[in-house]
Every structure is written in structure tokens, then in C-alpha cells.
Amino acid sequence: MSDTPRKRIVIAEDDPAISTMLNKVLSQFYEVVVTHDGMAALAVAGKPPAPDLLLLDVMMPGMDGHSVAAAARQLPGLKSIPIIFLTAKTGPSEVIKGIQSGARHYITNPFKIDDLVLRVKKTLGG
């Protein structure tokens, strides 16, 4: 067993079924912290240890994924953190907005979990 610390992912997903599934699958490979809204995700991400990835639902009550991404870019430890957006919004303007918000990937619902895991691994270099 390796002594290398596992990479840390902060997830913001307000749908309990999706957040549970993401936690179950991704925690096999990474340290996962699940939050259910944008404000909580930003609070967790802003405290040490900094996450290696933010996995954000775009449509959440209160602070949406785009707002979390914009706020994260203002924090010194999170300026260059990779972001993956999950969303039901599929229009071209939404994808462009996601990329402009700093997303490495923009995954639309419904998604295949294997595809998401592959994108996470690619983003985190493993």
C-alpha cells in the first residue's frame, strides 16, 4: 500500500441520489467530500487541505456551480484548481459558459458513471 496521500475531490451536488452515487464510486480512488450546495462546497474547499478537483452541479439552490467556480478563482489556493461541471443544461451557450467559468469538462445528465470516472482520472493525472 502506498503512503502517497489520495487526491481530494470536493463535490457539490444537491440531488441526494447523484451525490451518493458519486461518493460511492469516486471514494474507491480518491478522498471525497460531498456537499449539497455551493456555499458549503466553497467553505470546505477554502480550508486546508485544498482539494485537487471541484466537481460541481451547475444548478443548485443559492450559489450555483458557476458562482462557486468564480468565487474559487478568487481564493489563492484555488485559483488553478480543475473544475468539472455536471448539469442537465445542454445548450451550446451553457457549455460555453461552463468553459468560460474555468471547467475542464462539462458533463451533461444523464451521464455514464464510467465516462465521469475516466474524465476525473484524466483531469487528476491518473
Range-by-range predicted roles:
Residues 13:
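Conserved acidic carboxylate
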Residues 16-34, 123:
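Two-component/phosphorelay signaling modules centered on CheY-like receiver
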Residues 34-53:
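Acidic, metal-coordinating helix/loop segments flanking the phosphotransfer/catalytic sites
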Residues 57, 87:
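Active-site residues of response regulator receiver
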Residues 60:
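Receiver (REC) domain active-site loop signature in two-component systems and cognate sites
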Residues 111-120:
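C-terminal output helix
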